Design a protein with these regions (language model features):
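ATPase catalytic-site recognition across NTP-hydrolyzing enzymes
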Residues: 1-74
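Gly/Thr-rich phosphate-binding beta-strand-loop-beta motif of the actin/hexokinase/Hsp70
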Residues: 63-92
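Mg2+-dependent endonuclease catalytic cores in nucleic-acid-processing enzymes, primarily RNase H-like
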Residues: 93-204
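Acidic two-metal-ion nuclease catalytic site recognized across multiple nuclease folds
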Residues: 104, 219, 226-248
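Structural motif
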Residues: 161-162, 211-220
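Short, solvent-exposed helix-loop connector elements
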Residues: 201-215
Length: 248
C-alpha cells in the first residue's frame, strides 16, 4: 500500500533538511535565523508571464538584445546531492531600478567543461555583458574555461570579507524591493533563506554560511545571484571594472 512512485532517500539527498520539510512534507520553515527572511523574499515574487512583457522564455533570444548578467556558484561538497547554481539576471534599465532573475539552473553530476559549455550556450541566447564566478574547487575549472570565450569574466576568491560584501549588496537590493523573480521559482527563495549569520573558525570575525548537511543544497542559487548583483557597486551607480574580487 501507499505511494511507491518516489524514492524518499534520494529526495533527502537532493534537498536540504529545511527544503525537504517545506517542499515535500508541507511544513513551515523557520526563517528567524535567516539573513533574508521569507517576508522580504515574498515581496520579490511576481507572475513573470504577466509582468515581464519584454521577456519571452520560449523564444530563441528570450530577452532580445537587452543586456543580462550571469552569476555562477560551484558545487562545494563531494556528494551527489550537491549542485552548482547559475542564474541569468536582467540589470535595471534605469539607475535604482529592479533586477530580474530571468533563468536559474542547478547542475548536478556535470564536470567543469560541461558546466562551462552550458554557460557558453547562455551567452549565445542572451546579450551577456558580465559573468561572475566563484572559483572555489570545481569553480576554478569552470572559470578557466569560461575565460577562454568570455575574457572579462570576474573571479570571486572567497573569504569572510568577500562574503560580507556579497551579502550586504544583496540585502540592500532585496530590502529595497529591487529584485524580482517568478513566484513559481520557490527554490530561489529557499536558497536565500538558507543563508545564516556565523563566525569564522577563530570565532572573532562575522561571516555567512548556508545551513546544510554535506550531501544537501548549499544555497547555490542565492550565491550565484549575489555574484551577478555585485556587478552593481554598493553605491548603485556604474559597474566596477576589476575582474578579481579578493578582499583581506
Amino acid at each position: 500500500g501507499g505511494c511507491n512512485l518516489f524514492d524518499l532517500d534520494q529526495l533527502r539527498m537532493e534537498y536540504s533538511p529545511d527544503e525537504y520539510q517545506n517542499l515535500l512534507m508541507c511544513e513551515f520553515v523557520d526563517d528567524l535565523a535567516s539573513v533574508f527572511p521569507l517576508s522580504e523574499l515574498q515581496a520579490c515574487m511576481v507572475d513573470s508571464w504577466e509582468v515581464w512583457t519584454d521577456f519571452h522564455a520560449l523564444a530563441l533570444r528570450p530577452f532580445g538584445w537587452r543586456e543580462v548578467w550571469i552569476g555562477y556558484d560551484p558545487a562545494k561538497g563531494t556528494q551527489n546531492g550537491d549542485s552548482a547554481g547559475c542564474v541569468v539576471v536582467a540589470p535595471p534599465a534605469v539607475p535604482g531600478g529592479k533586477f530580474r532573475i530571468l533563468e536559474r539552473h542547478q547542475w548536478r553530476g556535470m564536470d567543469f567543461r560541461a558546466q562551462a559549455d552550458a554557460i557558453k550556450k547562455l551567452t549565445e541566447q542572451y546579450n551577456v555583458t558580465y559573468i561572475g564566478i566563484d572559483s572555489t574547487g570545481v569553480g576554478h575549472g569552470v572559470y578557466e574555461n569560461v575565460k577562454a570565450f568570455f575574457p572579462a569574466v570576474r573571479e570571486f576568491v572567497y573569504n569572510p570579507n568577500v562574503k560580507n560584501a556579497l551579502v550586504l549588496k544583496a540585502y540592500d537590493i532585496i530590502s529595497h524591493r529591487r529584485l524580482e523573480f517568478d513566484a513559481g521559482h520557490t527554490d530561489i527563495a529557499q536558497s536565500f533563506m538558507a543563508i545564516r549569520r556565523a563566525t569564522t573558525a577563530s570565532g572573532n570575525r562575522p561571516t555567512y554560511e548556508a545551513s546544510r548537511s554535506e550531501e544537501a543544497s548549499h544555497a547555490d542559487l542565492a550565491w550565484a545571484t549575489m555574484h551577478a548583483l555585485f556587478n552593481e557597486p554598493l553605491q548603485g551607480e556604474s559597474a566596477n571594472t576589476s575582474n578579481i574580487v579578493e578582499i583581506f
